[in-house]
A protein has these predicted regions:
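N-terminal accessory nucleic-acid engagement/regulatory domains that precede
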Residues: 1-49
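Conserved P-loop NTPase motor module
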Residues: 439, 443-566, 573, 619-623, ...
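P-loop NTPase motor domains
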Residues: 32-38, 70, 74, 78-380, ...
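Acidic, low-complexity, intrinsically disordered interaction modules
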Residues: 584, 588-592, 642-645
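Carbohydrate-binding surface patches
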Residues: 473-476, 585, 599-601
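Repeat-associated, polar segments at repeat-unit boundaries in modular proteins
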Residues: 591-624, 657-680
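N-terminal pre-Walker A segment at the start of P-loop NTPase domains
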Residues: 47-76
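Conserved ATP-driven motor cores of ASCE-family P-loop NTPases powering translocation/secretion/packaging/pilus
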Residues: 372-374, 378-476
Length: 682
């Protein structure tokens, strides 16, 4: 029995030891063995479902990219089907905004028969690419009427010429350009609209633009002429502007803020009101800007008509160059170009057009928010590039910046930091993630459970840590072309077909040969591939640009000389109307029955008729008023004392048959014969 008991005891001990070892093994395996559920959690949380199907339409833009999802790398496609709902590409310098997104978009839309406007901040980088796509398109479609245009302030031998202000004819357009010019000069202007001095500067600039638009058929209306005119002393300009406003009611409205100061001859006050319209104008005097933004008879064949960019009959690809070294000067010039283009494009029934503005905050596009809001109905694909939301707020103001950002439907994001990254991460929403967890029971069994929870689809840290060429974003779809997976995160694949590479090498080699013949160095990032339209030496360029500036200054001077002659007569008429001298009009109105006082009326009428007659020399645009209608407007402008006096003047004209200049001169001669010439010496 003792032996049996010992045996049983030993057996029990062995069984207990085995059980203990088995239990310990399970615990060790649970805590120390590689955790498959953790690996599975990482796999399940890796990325999110994205589009792997290429969806092309006649107006789509498509990018190939690779992305990670559940531990595997996939090839996907960013299918931008709603190109008319605007796009922005945001990212710090070096993220690949242009190379990854803007350049492929330009290539594809040009191939799909779009017109295009391209703001090339680092001229001629994008311009060379557009020209390459233009050449490729023309080879594929030799009968096409598509044209190419290039405006550059640094490559004068290659540049076309274009006056963006040509054709402005309404006060609304003049005000719009005034805002554009002043905001380009001072980005804080947009936030100060409504303030007294800001509104005065805006009205004054608008009046000058309007006046140049109506004088001499508008042929002196350009940005260089406007800047030259604005640099004049206000006391010289105001009599001229006041006189012209007599015949144009909408211009008269613009003049109203200055009327009291002008009527009371408090011109120093006017100078204070207009200081912000003149600050910085000296630095805007640039000869290359003046050359590109004006036209002459010799340049008609290379003059760009902005109104024809989106023409169905002869659409155009227009590249607008800039240069970081001339930021302020060219920012103003390009602001005027892009604002005008945006207004002209935004109409129905035109050719589909792409509007590319990389580094858009380096200029100011007045009405950009409206262009984006209405682009879909007018078939305009807007693509904007910038570095950070704070830039937009700084240069466009909070309200306009919010309107731009919140109405753009297609968003492409490279690496950005801080608040911008946080806001964008939140905008991409959350994703559902399955999480596997396991536990061990008291009896040693391991149980596994699966739960779902929400995580940010794209986190702030993901955006901040994106590598070059990596982007996140969201695209919009169209009715009937719905896209399930709108958000993407991956590395864009930019492929260059062999045919495209051969064309690139052909254009580059041709340019290198031209540089060699001309004794110039070929600089890959600075030399345009675009053919020359003139072949001037550096000295000849300087001479031509200088002569053009002199021509502009002389034209403005001649305009002012002609206007001042008439304005001097206008001053005399105003004095004869309100003054108390011997020959002033009030003496006649006080004693209309006194024969010797009639000369006051006749002298006044002679000066008024002379003004109306001489205004015909100004070749006023849309001059549809008769001599009598102009006289009536002039009369009501200078005589504001009483309605009775006004009627008295009109009746006296008829009574004495003094209805034109010749009849009044005859009446004055008769008066001199009767009373002696010594009485008539006003």
């Amino acid at each position: 029995l003792t032996a049996v008991g010992q045996s049983l005891n030993i057996l029990g001990s062995l069984i207990s030891a085995v059980c203990i070892l088995s239990y310990c093994g399970r615990i060790t395996k649970f805590y120390l063995a590689p955790d498959r559920s953790l690996n599975e959690n990482e796999r399940l949380a890796d990325g999110f479902e994205q589009t792997t199907e290429l969806i092309e339409t006649p107006t789509s833009v498509n990018w190939k990219y690779e992305f990670s999802y559940q531990g595997k790398t996939h090839i996907g496609y960013i299918n931008e089907l709603a190109v008319y709902r605007a796009s922005f590409v945001i990212g710090m310098p070096g993220t690949g905004k242009s190379h990854s997104f803007l350049d492929p978009a330009m290539k594809q839309l040009i191939a799909k028969h779009f017109s295009a406007v391209v703001y090339d901040y680092k001229d001629p980088t994008l311009s060379n690419a557009v020209y390459q796509y233009y050449v490729a398109y023309k080879r594929e479609h030799p009968a096409s009427t598509l044209r190419f245009g290039y405006l550059s302030y640094v490559n004068i031998n290659h540049t076309y010429r274009c006056n963006p202000m040509k054709g402005i004819s309404t006060s609304a357009e003049a005000v719009n350009f005034a805002i554009t010019i002043l905001t380009a000069l001072n980005k804080n202007f947009v936030e100060k609209q409504g303030e007294f001095f800001t509104e005065s500067a805006k009205s004054y600039t608008a009046i000058v633009i309007y006046a140049l638009g109506v004088l001499f058929g508008g042929r002196y209306l350009s940005l260089p002429h406007t800047l030259t005119m604005l640099s004049q002393v206000p006391s010289v300009l105001f009599p001229v502007l006041k006189l012209i406003s007599v015949l144009y009611p909408d211009m008269k409205t613009l003049f109203s803020p200055f009327k009291e100061a002008y009527d009371t001859n408090t011109l120093p006050q006017l100078q204070g009101q207009l200081a912000s319209a003149q600050i910085g104008l000296g630095s805007m005097s640039d000869a290359s800007l003046a050359y590109v933004m004006t036209e002459d008879e010799e340049s008609r064949d290379i003059a760009v008509d902005l109104d024809t960019i989106s023409s169905k009959e002869s659409p155009m690809l227009l590249c607008l160059g800039s240069n970081p070294r001339l930021g302020a000067v060219l920012g103003l010039a390009n602001a005027v170009y892009l604002t005008r283009i945006a207004n002209l494009l935004n109409r129905k029934g035109r050719n589909p057009t792409a509007f590319f503005a990389d580094e858009v905050v380096t200029t100011y596009i007045n009405g950009l928010d409206n262009l984006i809001a209405t682009a879909r109905s007018n078939k305009i694909a807007v693509f904007l590039g910038f570095q950070d939301f704070s830039q937009m707020v700084r240069d466009y103001g909070q309200k306009i910046s919010d309107a731009i950002v919140n109405t753009v439907n297609n968003v492409f994001v490279g690496a950005v930091k801080g608040k911008t990254a946080k806001e964008l991460a939140e905008s991409f929403g959350k994703k559902t993630v399955k999480k596997i967890s396991k536990s061990i029971t008291e009896d040693g069994k391991v149980t596994t459970s699966i739960a779902e929870h929400k995580e940010e689809r794209i986190t702030q840290s993901m955006i901040e840590e994106l590598s070059q060429g990596e982007f996140v974003g969201r695209i919009a779809d169209e009715y009937g072309k719905e896209i399930k997976c709108k958000v993407f995160h991956g590395k864009v694949i930019v492929e260059t077909p062999e045919k495209e590479q051969r064309l690139r090498e052909e254009l580059e080699n041709r340019t290198k040969n031209e540089c060699e013949r001309d004794g110039r160095s070929y600089l890959p990032d600075e030399t345009p591939w675009i053919p020359k339209v003139r072949n001037w030496s550096d000295e000849e360029i300087k001479r031509r640009l200088r002569l053009n500036v002199i021509k502009i200054n002389n034209e403005v001077s001649d305009v002012l000389l002609k206007l001042n002659e008439i304005a001097d007569t206008y001053k005399i008429l105003t004095h004869l109307t309100t003054g108390t001298d011997e020959f002033c009009l009030r003496h006649y109105l006080a004693e209309p029955q006194n024969p010797q006082k009639r000369i006051n009326l006749f002298v006044w009428l002679e000066e008024a008729y002379r003004i109306v007659w001489r205004m015909g020399e100004l070749e006023l645009k849309d001059d549809i008023l008769s001599f009598e209608e102009k006289f009536q407007l002039l009369l009501r402008d200078v005589y504001t004392t009483s309605y009775e006096g006004l009627q008295q003047i009109l009746k006296a004209r008829e009574q004495y048959h003094a209805m034109d200049l010749n009849s009044v001169k005859q009446l004055i001669d008769e008066y001199e014969d009767e009373y002696g010439t010594n009485l008539v010496n006003p």
